[in-house]
């Protein structure tokens, strides 16, 4: 490093600015006291919506984007499984699976539900005559 000139004001100004700055401005607060100081300070908002932007409430918007179809579940599962029939002995297991599981009640899992239903249809329990 080069030696500084005797009359250089830059390091003195830097040290003065560093000494006068708030405690939390140097990086992470140290200890509990620093954490309490930063919690009391108002936090700036990162996003402020524009006034009159014409946004709709999220509930009505989701209803417009995803219209409910009562046969949507049946359409998806019939598309994935194909023609699947269940014997009368197996109807209890079918109803338990179709109406009471997450796979058959959540649209994200309909493909898994279709796989479970086809495995149930070809299982030895349901294929007995």
Curated annotation (Swiss-Prot):
Signal peptide interval: 1-27
Protein's name in the database: ALK and LTK ligand 1
Function field: Cytokine that acts as a physiological ligand for receptor tyrosine kinase LTK, leading to its activation. Monomeric ALKAL1 binds to LTK, leading to LTK homodimerization and activation. In contrast to ALKAL2, does not act as a potent physiological ligand for ALK.
Principal location: secreted
Keywords from the named record: Cell membrane, Cytokine, Disulfide bond, Membrane, Secreted, Signal
GO terms for cellular component: extracellular region; extracellular space; plasma membrane
Disulfide partners: 90-126, 104-113
Location within or outside the cell: Secreted; Cell membrane
Pfam family, one: ALKL1_2
Organism field: Homo sapiens (Human)
Entries under InterPro entries matching the protein: ALKL1/2
Chain intervals with Basic residues compositional bias: 25-35
One of the GO BP terms on file: positive regulation of neuron projection development
Region (Disordered) residue spans: 24-63
One GO MF term attached to the UniProt entry: receptor tyrosine kinase binding
Tissues and organs where the protein is expressed, per its UniProt entry: Widely expressed with highest levels in thyroid and moderate levels in stomach, trachea, small intestine, prostate and brain.
Superkingdom to which the source organism belongs: Eukaryota
Similarity section: Belongs to the ALKAL family.
Lineage start: Eukaryota, Metazoa, Chordata, Craniata, Vertebrata
